[in-house]
Structures are given as structure tokens and as C-alpha cells.
From Swiss-Prot:
Protein name: Formamidase
E.C. no: 3.5.1.49
InterPro entries: Aliph_Amidase/BUP, C-N_Hydrolase, C-N_Hydrolase_sf, Formamidase
Matches recorded under NCBIfam families: PRK13287.1
Keywords: Hydrolase
Family indicated by similarity: Belongs to the carbon-nitrogen hydrolase superfamily. Aliphatic amidase family.
Annotated active site: 60, 129, 162
Function: Is an aliphatic amidase with a restricted substrate specificity, as it only hydrolyzes formamide.
A molecular function (GO) term: formamidase activity
Cystines in this chain: none
Gene source species: Allorhizobium ampelinum (strain ATCC BAA-846 / DSM 112012 / S4)
Gene Ontology BP, a term: putrescine biosynthetic process from arginine
Residue intervals of the CN hydrolase domain: 14-257
Length: 338
């Protein structure tokens, strides 16, 4: 059930709109300013489209396109004009918004960041992509963790970006911290279509969590993005799915975070987010509450290493034209983003 794309709002429903934004080409500060206005105008379109919409979501790369340009002249800052324009648009249209920026980083490569702004224009969530799509993307690994916030109607929201969603641990972290709706923004192109679809569904089902997911759309003359706005219910079923590939179409649905809460408390079979920490609770009181997974221990101890580690062929970005890095994670480099 999606309330006819959110046209029929229930008492506890949250209306979500996913903008399958036309893929832009952004080279200059003037291009950046024009694309900012495009997004601002689409916030207003979303409000006109559905007066009951609570949250409008724009894809990753909505401002900058897919060029991977790290020119500091077109990088954004949290106190810059682009974020200010998004805040004003949300306040003026009385709607929550999720936006993508490539963020200037004086100590390294730019961050691929996402923000959520409420309907008063206040910044509520600030996230930096944790898993850049290597070896293609040059972005600095995110360092803010995964925040979870109180969103529209009190729904618990989390945001991850594109390739993040290919790691089951990311969706699990969102749910473990309480997220009832996980937003996933992306710039993926057509070769990733099937992987995109089944991970959106599995991220929902494995965590009893709604997922709201959207890519860029259309062509920039080089790349072809796919749109594929997709909202999945907490049981993994698809509530809404944009399959037309039509640019700037807004895929809409109502979701029910109250039913997510009910399922997490009331489900027995396939309550996987609970059962992970309570293995075999029929046999032993409270279930086994150990951590039997080797990779978890190794990752936490800084010794994550695959049996075939030394044979992995692609371990930096040189194949995609980037210089081999010498700086370690967490160490600043004055000129890395210049």
C-alpha cells in the first residue's frame, strides 16, 4: 500500500517524493549557481505536486554531475550559498528536503556529503559518504558515522549514499541506531540497475526498515543515469518504483513508520535485526549474545584481511587517472584538494 503515491495520506503516514533529477554538467561556479536554482525550483514543484508531501529527496551528484571534478572553485561549504538556498527553499515551501553536495575539505580530498533540512529551514542531518565508489570516485572517506534523526511526523531517518548501500553493514547500522526510514541517494548508471534493485529490497527486509532510494536520471552526453526511484516497505516489497527513466519525474509514496515499529516489536519469524544478537533464543534463555563473526573482530582490531588480500589487483585509483595516495586516513594534506 502506498496511498496512491501519497495522494491519500493516513494519520500516521509520511509522504516521500524522490526526484529523478536530470544529470547536469557543472564546470564553473556559474554552472553551480544555475544548478542550485534548478534544485530550488524542483523543491517548489514537489510542494505544488503534492500538498501532503513531507520529504523531498534529491539524488547524489544533483549539483555537480558525474565528472568527479575536484576543482575547489566548485566545491561547496556548509556555510555557503548552495546550502543556504536549500534551507530557504525548504522553509518557503514548508517541506523537508534531502540534498547532495561535494564538500570542500582543506585537509584532503573533497567529501561527498548529504544533508537533510527540515520544513523551517534548519539543518537536521549532516552525513559524509563512508564508502566512495572506488576506484572511480576520489572522495575522502566519511568520518561522521551514520546519524539518525527525528524526521517528519517523528519518523526516525538515516541517510546513506550510493555505494554505501552495497554494504549490508551500512543498512544494519542505520537500523541498529533506530532508523525506521533509510534514504539512499545515488548517481548510479544502468550497469548497476539489478544490483540497485535487490540491495534496496534486501536492506529493507533484513532490517525491518523502509528504504527510499533514488538515482540521477537522463544523459549528460557521456553518462546515462537511470532514475530508478524506489521505495521498499519493511518486508522488502516494493511500494513505488520509477521505471520510465523520465527526467525530473517525482516518484511518490506514503510510508508508515508506525508499522515499522509494530513489526520490530511484534514479529517472531524473520525479525532479523533483533535475532542477530539473540541467536537461538528458543534453545537458550535470551539467545546466544556472542559475536561469532571473525570479520567483525578483525575489522574492529584494525586487522581486516582477506585470504586473497595480496592477490587483489586494484587497490588505488591509478586505473581511473588518479595519483596513487601516500597519505594515511586521518592525516591532513594541505594541497590534496587543490
Amino acid at each position: 500500500m502506498n496511498g496512491l503515491g501519497g495522494l491519500n495520506k493516513s494519520e500516521h503516514g509520511v509522504g516521500i517524493g524522490l526526484v529523478q533529477l536530470q544529470l547536469p554538467v557543472t564546470v564553473t561556479p556559474q554552472d553551480l549557481a544555475r544548478q542550485t536554482q534548478v534544485i530550488v525550483d524542483l523543491v517548489a514543484k514537489a510542494r505544488r505536486n503534492q500538498p501532503g508531501m513531507d520529504l523531498v529527496v534529491f539524488p547524489e551528484y544533483a549539483l555537480h554531475g558525474l565528472s568527479m571534478d575536484i576543482n575547489p572553485d566548485i566545491m561547496c561549504r556548509m556555510d555557503g550559498p548552495e546550502v543556504a538556498a536549500f534551507k530557504a527553499a525548504c522553509k518557503q515551501n514548508r517541506i523537508w528536503g534531502c540534498f547532495s553536495i561535494m564538500e570542500y575539505n582543506p585537509g584532503g580530498m573533497p567529501y561527498n556529503s548529504g544533508i537533510i533540512i527540515d520544513d523551517t529551514g534548519a539543518l537536521k542531518l549532516y552525513y559524509r559518504k563512508m564508502h566512495p565508489w572506488v576506484p572511480v570516485e576520489p572522495w575522502e572517506p566519511g568520518d561522521l558515522g551514520i546519524p539518525v534523526i527525528d524526521g517528519p511526523k517523528g519518523a526516525k531517518l538515516a541517510l546513506i549514499i550510493c555505494h554505501d548501500g552495497m554494504f549490508p553493514e551500512m543498512a544494519r547500522e542505520c537500523a541498529y541506531k533506530g532508523a525506521e526510514i533509510m534514504i539512499r541517494t545515488a548517481g548510479y548508471t544502468a550497469p548497476i540497475r539489478e544490483s540497485w534493485r535487490f540491495t534496496n529490497q534486501s536492506n529493507a527486509f533484513c532490517n525491518l526498515m523502509v528504504t527510499a532510494n533514488v538515482c540521477m536520471c537522463g544523459s549528460d552526453g557521456t553518462f546515462d543515469s537511470m532514475g530508478e526511484g524506489m521505495i521498499c516497505n519493511f518486508d522488502g516489497s516494493i511500494i513505488a518504483h520509477g521505471t520510465s527513466g523520465r527526467v525530473n519525474e517525482i516518484i511518490t509514496a506514503e510510508v508508515r513508520p508506525d508499522l515499522v515499529r509494530e513489526a520490530r516489536l511484534g514479529w517472531g519469524v524473520e525479525n532479523n535485526i533483533y535475532q542477530l544478537g539473540h541467536r537461538g533464543y528458543v534453545a537458550v534463555a535470551g539467545g546466544a549474545q556472542d559475536a561469532p563473526y571473525t570479520y567483525m573482530h578483525d575489522l574492529a582490531a584494525g586487522r581486516y584481511r582477506l585470504p586473497w588480500e595480496v592477490e587483489v589487483k586494484i587497490t588505488d585509483g591509478t586505473a581511473c587517472g588518479f595519483e596513487k595516495p601516500t597519505r594515511l586516513y586521518g592525516k591532513p594534506a594541505k594541497s590534496a584538494a587543490e
